[in-house]
UniProtKB/Swiss-Prot annotation:
This is GTP cyclohydrolase FolE2. It holds the Pfam family GCHY-1. It comes from Burkholderia mallei (strain ATCC 23344). GO terms for biological process: tetrahydrofolate biosynthetic process. The record marks 151 as: May be catalytically important. It comes from the Bacteria.
């Protein structure tokens, strides 16, 4: 007899405390993945995964090794549809009725400088989350987009110049259909005073300086303009949108948030 089959399976025994656990699983598992770009190509990256399931009151433990096995078996680009399939597979493997998968990873866009045309990579922080509860599967895409903001008040009251700073626009969107990460990035960048690039030449610096000056926005303007774009996108059913300006003339940030669920009209 194989000794493995003769070993007791303690986690499968009955627990007498009768206390369900809402979420139990593994966290901070680093594992490679591929994602599909807006052009239909694939990009390889490394994800930090959190996977968990609901544990019934009478079950002592979950099958921890099966979470990692799920990552080992997974293949192909991680689209919204693939994420839903992965969630269903996890619940089947873990014999669970509810569960959650979250993966965070750096995503790179090869950007072209506005004047010189020089190419360079810019990184973005992306988190995909899938949640199954009460028979309902929900998928979320979250991306942090660094941009430039320039203060309208500073421009208005100054004889020349205006204070400007780097800002973060964070979009956390619940998806009804697959949305490429770059689509969310472009929405944030197009509504900012100016976008960022990894590498710029002097003609490019002149362009971005003047672009921001001609397009001043308060943090309130920034979050509202991005929200209007998200409202018009039928692939997005709900969102939490944040903007934070790291003020260059203060030792604090300016911050704004808009949260909306289109299904409730609010």
């Amino acid at each position: 007899m194989n000794p493995e089959f003769a070993m007791p399976d303690v986690q499968s025994t009955v627990d007498t405390r009768q206390m369900p656990i809402q979420r139990v699983g593994v966290r901070a598992v680093r594992h490679p993945l591929t994602v599909r770009t807006a052009e239909g190509e694939t990009q390889a990256t490394v994800g930090t995964w959190n996977l968990d399931v609901h544990l019934p009151a009478d079950q002592k433990g979950t099958h921890m090794s099966r979470f990692v096995a799920l990552l080992e078996e997974r293949g192909g680009p991680l689209t919204a549809d693939a994420f839903r399939t992965m969630l269903a597979t996890m619940l089947e493997k873990l014999e669970a009725r509810a569960g959650r998968i979250e993966v965070s990873f750096p995503y790179f866009v090869n950007k072209t400088a506005p004047v010189s045309g020089v190419r360079s990579l810019l990184d973005y922080e992306v988190t995909l989350t899938g949640d199954v509860r009460d028979g309902l599967t929900r998928v979320f895409a979250k991306v942090l987009v660094p941009v430039t903001s320039l203060c309208p008040c500073s421009k208005k009251i100054s004889q020349y110049g205006a204070h400007n700073q780097r800002s973060h626009v964070t979009i956390d969107a619940e998806l009804a259909a697959d949305v490429p990460v770059e689509d969310l990035i472009r929405i944030a960048e197009e509504e900012a005073s100016c976008e960022l690039w990894g590498l710029l030449k002097r003609p490019d610096e002149k362009f971005v300086t003047e672009r921001a000056y001609e397009n001043p926005k308060f943090v309130e303007d920034l979050v509202r303009d991005v929200a209007r774009r998200l409202d018009a996108d039928e692939r997005i059913v709900a969102y939490v949108l944040e903007a934070e300006n790291f003020e260059s003339i203060h030792n604090h940030s300016a911050y704004a948030l808009i949260e909306r669920d289109k299904r409730r009209g609010a």
